[in-house]
């Protein structure tokens, strides 16, 4: 009898993607984060769907509807905290996934890498519009400040901001459309994930050694399905600990105050996963310059395949670039810390130094270290 999974039109696709997929035999746990991101996306869509059943996207009732979910809906508090902290877990996995891609040279698979950048931007957009929905103080002022950045665009800026707001300030129209965006974007992300996987399976996975692994492949199932299962269990355990014991540790206390357009919070700041980009934005005194730096802080990832001149794949045998890479990671952590600090000396100065370092490492130091290492190989 023919094996159904190999011949059925639909199951055949699943089989080639998750069961009989030829995978390098030496990929480490750093390759687990792709599947963990898939699990995070599923958790977010499911919890989000149940939240959307009880949420109302109206300025007068949005805050109360979130309180109602936590108080009156069966396990509503759990669904809400799983969704809020699930976003944090999503971004932790996302940052590690991108960091692994840079370290092991996965950016040489340029189609997969570029779709990944689009996915990163779409996920950031989804998280931003989602943060506005509870309609607390930080939700309202975060939306006001970030959308207002578009007014820096010459000629059409002010009109564009009013068009996005649906009026002359962040109000009911803004909240309604942000809810619509927040509902549809995860499904767009899901479609992009399929394209991401399609491109990845065209070329095959990268591996820690950076060498061609065509001669040494093993089937994805059962080897990597069980390896991924361990990662998934650890992720779920971390998420449950976060949601049950420390549900508000990554949130902002100001968001437990209903939105008030007449009262500005002392320090307006986004969620922790945007702080690095927010620090880069704040470090430039000019509004348009800050917006451009903010956009470039993400889009600069697209330059990795272009600026890579190394004759070796990945950083595993390249100590100079390895050192620069870890300085880059430390610099990112400094930017994240600075983004959450008030705009005052010495934080502004540290932020400016860290922002310059961020771009200098990628555009100047990494290509130079590539050239040095290429010359060392020739010796």
Swiss-Prot record:
The chain crosses the membrane at residues 33-53, 77-98, 113-133, 178-198, 226-246, 288-308, 320-340, 347-367. The keyword Transport applies. Heme b b566 binds at residues 97, 196. InterPro entries: Cyt_b/b6_C, Cyt_b/b6_C_sf, Cyt_b/b6_N, Cytb/b6-like_sf, Cytochrome_b, Cytochrome_b_C_euk/bac, Cytochrome_b_N_euk/bac, Di-haem_cyt_TM. GO terms for cellular component: mitochondrial inner membrane; respiratory chain complex III. It is a multi-pass membrane protein. Heme 1 (or BL or b562) is low-potential and absorbs at about 562 nm, and heme 2 (or BH or b566) is high-potential and absorbs at about 566 nm. The cytochrome bc1 complex contains 11 subunits: 3 respiratory subunits (MT-CYB, CYC1 and UQCRFS1), 2 core proteins (UQCRC1 and UQCRC2) and 6 low-molecular weight proteins (UQCRH/QCR6, UQCRB/QCR7, UQCRQ/QCR8, UQCR10/QCR9, UQCR11/QCR10 and a cleavage product of UQCRFS1). This cytochrome bc1 complex then forms a dimer. Component of the ubiquinol-cytochrome c reductase complex (complex III or cytochrome b-c1 complex) that is part of the mitochondrial respiratory chain. The b-c1 complex mediates electron transfer from ubiquinol to cytochrome c. Contributes to the generation of a proton gradient across the mitochondrial membrane that is then used for ATP synthesis. This is Cytochrome b. The gene is MT-CYB.
């Amino acid at each position: 009898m023919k094996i159904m999974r190999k011949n059925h039109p639909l199951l055949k696709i699943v089989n080639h993607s998750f069961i009989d997929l030829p995978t390098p035999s030496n990929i480490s746990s750093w390759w687990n984060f792709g599947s963990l991101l898939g699990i995070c996306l599923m958790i977010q869509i499911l919890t989000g769907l149940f939240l959307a059943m009880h949420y109302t996207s109206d300025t007068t009732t949005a805050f109360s509807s979130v309180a109602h979910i936590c108080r009156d809906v069966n396990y509503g508090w759990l669904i809400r905290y799983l969704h809020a902290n699930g976003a944090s877990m999503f971004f932790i996995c996302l940052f590690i996934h991108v960091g692994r891609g840079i370290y092991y040279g996965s950016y040489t698979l340029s189609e997969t890498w570029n779709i990944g950048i689009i996915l990163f931007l779409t996920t950031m957009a989804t998280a931003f519009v989602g943060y506005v929905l509870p309609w607390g103080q930080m939700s309202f002022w975060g939306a006001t400040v970030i959308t207002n950045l578009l007014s820096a665009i010459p000629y059409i800026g002010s009109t564009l901001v009013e068009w996005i707001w649906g009026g002359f300030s962040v109000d009911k129209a803004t909240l309604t459309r942000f809810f619509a965006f927040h509902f549809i974007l995860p499904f767009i992300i899901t479609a992009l994930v399929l394209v991401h996987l399609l491109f990845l399976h065209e070329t095959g996975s990268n591996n820690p050694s950076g060498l061609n692994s065509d001669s040494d492949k093993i089937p994805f199932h059962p080897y990597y399905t069980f390896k991924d299962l361990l990662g998934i269990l650890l992720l779920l355990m971390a998420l449950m600990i976060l949601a049950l014991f420390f549900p508000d540790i990554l949130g902002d206390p100001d968001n437990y105050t209903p939105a008030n357009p007449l009262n500005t919070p002392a320090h307006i700041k986004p969620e922790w996963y945007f702080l690095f980009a927010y620090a880069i934005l704040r470090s430039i005194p000019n509004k348009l310059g800050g917006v451009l730096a903010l956009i470039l802080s993400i889009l600069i990832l697209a330059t990795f395949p272009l600026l890579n001149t190394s004759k070796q794949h990945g950083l595993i045998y390249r100590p100079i670039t390895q050192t620069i890479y870890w300085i880059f990671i430390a610099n990112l952590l400094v930017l994240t810390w600075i983004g959450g600090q008030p705009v005052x000396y010495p934080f502004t100065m540290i932020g400016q130094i860290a922002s310059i370092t961020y771009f200098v490492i990628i555009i100047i130091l990494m290509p130079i270290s590539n050239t040095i290492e290429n010359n060392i190989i020739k010796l």
